[in-house]
Regions:
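Alpha-helix termini
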Residues: 85-95, 104, 147-151, 180-183
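Divalent metal-dependent phosphoesterase catalytic cores across multiple superfamilies
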Residues: 65-95, 137-145
Length: 269
């Protein structure tokens, strides 16, 4: 369905991310190889929309069993994410519409230095920034390609996270340009950190969870996306950030916090 973004005051972090996104888009415009078309499925169910939530993948993170009890790295992250999508597609209906809801922190760090963007806390990384970005782009393109074999239309949300505030903007712009000639793919290019999608009388909202807590997110979405919220009967909010599952019903919408596929890092352990 149709959806509209309500842009309010942009804080300095959001403004910097949008500036980076504009730079990437201008640099790539007209020169980026476009996606090769994927044959659409023979038959799909028009009344259904399938949402595939992925959050806190932390591609580029290093986790060693000796220190954390679990293992994670760039190669393992890519393999795990692609297996997750393959298994998910086998279990879902062939709906006409689908949403790839990547809810933030796809990448573990946001610059040449492996530190958190805001507080500059050191992070355990197993690769350099360029390789991490390359793998992240390959993963997103791979997920979309798989989804196009099952669903006729795919809407892509690549949410800002607290680990990849700026790079997530570059990812959105890159993927949008890459698929601009593919009418079966749409990309949410909002730079606010809050995202919405409408299917029939259902509104779906997405935010990483680093700026607004789950208990407080309902009014934020309802006010930012007045038309979507006001013209749908059921609303669902999807968040990540805290790496574990929590589902709450509020007076405004159902709020679900999704778990991570990634292992713990040294800080969490």
């Amino acid at each position: 369905g149709n959806w509209n973004s309500v842009f309010w005051k942009i804080d300095p972090t959001e403004e910097q991310a949008q500036t980076l996104a504009d730079t990437v888009r201008d640099a790539l415009d007209g020169d980026l190889p476009k996606a090769t078309p994927v044959a659409p499925p023979a038959a799909t169910l028009d009344d259904y929309c399938t949402v595939y939530p992925l959050t806190d993948a932390h591609i580029g993170m290093l986790s060693q069993p000796e220190e954390t009890g679990t293992e994670w790295g760039t190669t393992l992250a890519e393999q795990t994410i692609m297996r997750w999508m393959t298994c998910s597609l086998e279990l879902t209906k062939p709906s006409t519409y689908a949403v790839l809801a990547e809810i933030g922190d796809l990448l573990h760090f946001d610059s040449l230095d492996a530190v958190t963007p805001t507080n500059k806390n050191p992070l355990d990384a197993d690769t350099c920034y360029q390789v991490m970005l390359r793998v992240g782009l390959r993963v997103v393109r791979g997920l979309i390609r798989l989804m196009l074999t099952k669903h006729r239309y795919v809407h892509v949300v690549l949410a800002e996270g607290n680990h990849d505030e700026s790079t997530s903007a570059a990812l959105r712009e890159f993927i949008a340009v890459h698929y601009e000639d593919e009418p079966r793919v749409t990309v949410d290019q909002s730079g606010t950190g809050f995202y919405a999608y409408r299917h029939g009388d259902v509104s779906l909202f997405f935010h990483h969870g680093h700026k607004v807590k789950p208990a407080e997110i309902g009014p934020v979405f309802a006010s930012r996306f007045r038309e979507d919220y006001g013209n749908t009967r059921r609303s669902y909010a999807h968040l990540g950030h805290l790496h574990h599952v929590e589902v709450k019903g509020t007076n405004l919408m159902k709020v679900e916090q999704h778990p991570t596929l990634a292992a713990m890092d040294a800080y969490a352990a």
